[in-house]
């Protein structure tokens, strides 16, 4: 869930383009949730919604202008100081803009060899339940990201070497062949990624010539070195963290990258971006709902579209809990998860918007979500592997079932509860689910079904476009009540959530089309004759008028805007 989404966290996660609010009459009064959902539904139809909804020509035009705006000025006194070849190892940072590792590689050499390693472990199975580690939709998104990254590097005089294999085998071999003394890369925080860093470093040492791996921090809005406390003293409560960094930290300026980065060394075969079939993955086409376009250019295009073209940033706080349509939230999280855009770039675009248009609670709330994303990344360092354990960071003891049939009903959208089934249908069809939906389906799996929360977390890992381990597992531990903050133990009442966030049943009718012919008041409670039996009774409330115990809030606490597993807002 976390991910990020912005949650700003997703297997997830997050970025669906919903309704177009620029057609609404905007006043100083907050928009009611019912009016938002009605407008959202009016804009949705059976067609696929491309995100961003820009033509290829528009995406390219926006990208060119943005790259120029954020480029290192030609008049800058900064010059390259190093000699020889450096290797730039791309990981979850598939961008040119604000790429600290790229800048460091450029400034410390006279030749850069950019490399992406298609690690076969990425397409193995998850740790506990053997689900596909990378589903077809996220795999396809990744391939689009690589195509776009190569294109943007070539515009700057570079290229992208693509090799299939383990980085700890590929990178030392390349360092030896090209005489590179340093491999630059961005630092990751979770155990699988850190293990690969260790193996790469060991392999480079065996090359000799003092060859080394130099890791750069570049994945958060607030830099790790600027925190007002050691990361292992990170507050257990998000609000304490947020208030501390807002009061005591500055956000560094994004790194300006020169428009010309060449040359590259002579390479006989740069390698092709493979098809999913070559990676052993059956491709999947989006047949309904949101179809996200991978790559830095599309990510930059989405920021332009949401902030500037549709002017939706000013109403983000009022709409962020929507469920239907492409524009109720930013949908930046898939690009954040792959590092196609950086949180600092979004921060600077928010600042520009506040200067040129308006500054209000909505513009701040996007940053609020980015701080959540930072928090989960820092938390993954503090908690280590306990983030993946059943009892979570606090080693909470509980009774958890691993009933496979029950889990499959959740996974396959056959629980008998339309709100759950619609969300799970959207996830499997698009690779995305709203923040609100993620919180609801997590609560249902953990509290109503009593299932091991890791089953849900690993399925999100399979499906979400915006999956990243920090946000995903951070959000799931919170949702399961085993997270860092002992106050996180919330139940989401399905009747209450349906009433508050899909009052007309438009969302469930969009994803479960057999419900569309029913009266709106019946769509969430169609009965077994019109729908199917429910697989479990609800812990709290079994009818349309039922309330809920401790329902409401978000995975992240009392802030209902918290992004389930997203990587961004």
Swiss-Prot record:
SUPFAM superfamilies: Cryptochrome/photolyase FAD-binding domain, Cryptochrome/photolyase, N-terminal domain
Additional notes on this entry: 5,10-methenyltetrahydrofolate (MTHF) acts as a functional antenna for the photoreduction of FAD.
Species annotation: Arabidopsis thaliana
Positions of ATP binding: 436, 485
Protein name: Cryptochrome DASH, chloroplastic/mitochondrial
InterPro entries (UniProt xref): Cry_DASH (IPR014133), Crypto/Photolyase_FAD-like_sf (IPR036134), Crypto/Photolyase_N_sf (IPR036155), Cryptochr/Photolyase_FAD-bd (IPR005101), Cryptochrome/DNA_photolyase_1 (IPR002081), DNA_photolyase_N (IPR006050), Rossmann-like_a/b/a_fold (IPR014729)
Job of this protein: May have a photoreceptor function. Binds ss- and ds-DNA in a sequence non-specific manner. Has a photolyase activity specific for cyclobutane pyrimidine dimers in ssDNA.
Skewed-composition ranges (Basic residues): 559-569
Protein localization: Plastid, Chloroplast; Mitochondrion
Subunit annotation: Homodimer.
This protein's encoding gene: CRYD
Domain Photolyase/cryptochrome alpha/beta: 84-221
Record GO biological process: photoreactive repair
Top-level taxon: Eukaryota
Family note: Belongs to the DNA photolyase class-1 family.
């Amino acid at each position: 869930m976390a991910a990020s989404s912005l949650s700003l966290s997703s297997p997830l996660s997050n970025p669906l383009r919903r309704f177009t609010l620029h057609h609404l009459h905007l006043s100083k009064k907050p928009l009611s949730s019912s009016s938002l959902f009605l407008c959202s539904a009016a804009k949705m139809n059976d067609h696929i919604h491309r995100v961003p909804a820009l033509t290829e020509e528009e995406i390219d035009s926006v990208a060119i202008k943005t790259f120029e705006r954020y480029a290192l000025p030609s008049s800058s006194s900064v010059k390259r100081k190093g000699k020889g070849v450096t290797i730039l190892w791309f990981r979850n940072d598939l961008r040119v803009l604000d790429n600290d590792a790229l800048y460091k590689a450029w400034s410390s050499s006279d030749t850069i060899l950019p490399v992406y390693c298609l690690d076969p472990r990425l397409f193995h199975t998850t740790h506990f339940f053997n689900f596909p580690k990378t589903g077809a939709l996220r795999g396809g998104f990744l391939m689009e990201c690589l195509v776009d990254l190569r294109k943007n590097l070539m515009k700057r005089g570079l290229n992208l070497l693509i090799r299939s294999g383990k980085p700890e085998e590929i990178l030392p071999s390349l360092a030896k062949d090209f005489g590179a003394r340093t491999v630059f890369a961005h630092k990751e925080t979770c155990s699988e990624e850190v293990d690969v860093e260790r193996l790469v470093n060991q392999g480079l040492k065996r090359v000799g010539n003092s060859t080394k791996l130099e890791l750069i921090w570049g994945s958060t809005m607030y830099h790790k070195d600027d925190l007002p406390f050691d990361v292992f003293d990170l507050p257990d409560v998000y609000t304490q963290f947020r208030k501390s960094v807002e009061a005591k930290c500055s956000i560094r300026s994004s790194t300006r990258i020169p428009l010309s980065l060449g040359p590259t060394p002579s390479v006989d075969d740069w390698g092709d971006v493979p098809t999913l079939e070559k990676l052993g993955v059956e491709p999947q086409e989006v047949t309904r709902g949101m179809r996200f376009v991978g790559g830095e250019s599309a990510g930059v295009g989405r920021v332009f579209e949401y902030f500037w073209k549709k002017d939706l940033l000013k109403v983000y706080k009022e709409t962020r809990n929507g469920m239907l349509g492409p524009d109720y939230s930013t949908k930046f999280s898939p690009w954040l998860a792959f590092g196609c855009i950086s949180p600092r770039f979004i921060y600077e675009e928010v600042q520009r918007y506040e200067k040129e248009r308006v500054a209000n609670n909505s513009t701040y709330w996007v940053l609020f979500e980015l701080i959540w994303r930072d928090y989960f990344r820092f938390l993954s360092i503090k908690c280590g592997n306990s983030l993946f354990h059943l009892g979570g960071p606090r080693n909470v003891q509980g009774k958890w079932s691993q009933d496979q049939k029950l889990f499959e009903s959740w996974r396959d959208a056959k629980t008998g509860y339309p709100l759950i089934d619609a969300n799970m249908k959207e996830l499997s069809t698009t690779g995305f689910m709203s923040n609100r939906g993620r919180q609801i389906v997590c609560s249902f799996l953990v509290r109503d079904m009593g299932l091991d929360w890791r089953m849900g977390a690993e399925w999100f890992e399979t499906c979400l476009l915006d999956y990243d381990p920090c946000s995903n597992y951070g959000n799931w531990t919170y949702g399961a009540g085993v997270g860092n903050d002992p106050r996180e133990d919330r139940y989401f009442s399905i009747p209450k959530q349906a009433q508050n966030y899909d009052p007309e049943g438009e969302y469930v009718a969009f994803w479960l089309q057999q419900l569309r012919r029913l009266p709106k008041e019946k769509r969430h409670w169609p009965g077994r004759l019109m729908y199917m039996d429910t697989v479990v009774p609800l812990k709290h409330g079994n009818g349309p008028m039922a309330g809920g115990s401790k329902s409401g809030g978000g995975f992240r606490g009392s802030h209902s805007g918290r992004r389930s597993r997203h990587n961004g807002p």
